[in-house]
A protein has these predicted regions:
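Solvent-exposed loop and edge beta-strand segments that line ligand/cofactor-binding
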Residues: 168-172
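Short linear motifs at protein or domain termini
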Residues: 1-98, 212-228
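Short arginine-rich
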Residues: 204-214
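Generic structural "secondary-structure junction" signal
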Residues: 26, 164-167
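Conserved amphipathic alpha-helical segments that form helical-bundle/coiled-coil interaction surfaces
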Residues: 101-165, 175-189, 194-205
Length: 228
């Protein structure tokens, strides 16, 4: 048994992280009894946690059958990338002309921090994911568009897991580092025409890198009817 978890929020945070970082694979079963034993929690508390996970699209509860981790919806992933490409390109075009020296320095520091994590002897994929989010959050925060950012970030069930799958399995971190450097350079040059193609290349990178693995090696991670 793990340490005693006193609240449903603490247990939820652990399971949410494990689902997002694919420690718990899409399609896996989550049974109440093993969870009660693992967390030293009563069944009533575990049921509250599972209900919240279902509300956030991370599990599906079928009465009298059990709870399973949802599979990713490929169509939703595609639409979220399409949406984020349009929104983030506009944010960067608005941000670059008014970026302060302090903001540019913060972006450089976060680009450097991501690269340091990516080149570490032992990679922590959760920290890489978090640092990537912090970098992109910089220009949303600078433009006072945090509602938009939170909306994009709340798409855990599909897009966040897709990003983690890309980060963990494709060996594409050098490409991501180069994308970040190119975005930083465009901000520093205030090259407004560069943002749309750079953002599109960066955000569609996961689909490009995963390629045929989406329909072969990782096909069981996705709802079958949504895989092209």
């Amino acid at each position: 048994m793990e340490q005693q978890y006193k609240t449903d929020a603490e247990i939820y945070a652990v399971l949410e992280r494990e689902i997002i970082d694919l420690t718990i694979r899409p399609g896996s079963s989550l049974s109440e009894n093993p969870l009660c034993a693992r967390f030293g929690a009563p069944r009533s508390l575990i049921r509250v946690v599972l209900q919240k996970l279902q509300e956030n699209g991370l599990v599906r509860i079928v009465p009298y059958k059990g709870t399973t981790v949802t599979r990713l919806n490929r169509r939703i992933v595609d639409e979220l990338i399409y949406e984020r490409t349009a929104v983030e390109g506009r944010i960067l075009r608005d941000f670059a002309p008014i970026a302060t020296p302090a903001q540019r320095a913060q972006i450089r520091a976060r680009v450097d921090a991501y690269e340091a994590l990516a080149r570490a002897e032992t990679q922590d994929f959760n920290k890489l994911y978090e640092m990537d989010c912090r970098l992109h959050e910089t220009w949303f925060a600078a433009m006072d568009k945090m509602y938009l950012w939170s909306t994009l970030q709340n798409a855990h069930a599909d897009y966040s897991r897709f990003r983690m799958l890309d980060t963990m399995t494709t060996g594409g971190l050098d490409e991501v580092i180069a994308d970040h450097r190119n975005l930083l350079n465009a901000i520093e040059r205030c090259d407004l025409a560069a943002f749309e193609p750079l953002v599109e290349r960066h955000l569609y990178g996961g689909i490009r890198r995963l390629g045929s693995k989406l329909t072969e090696e990782y096909a069981d991670f996705f709802e079958p009817e949504t895989v092209k």
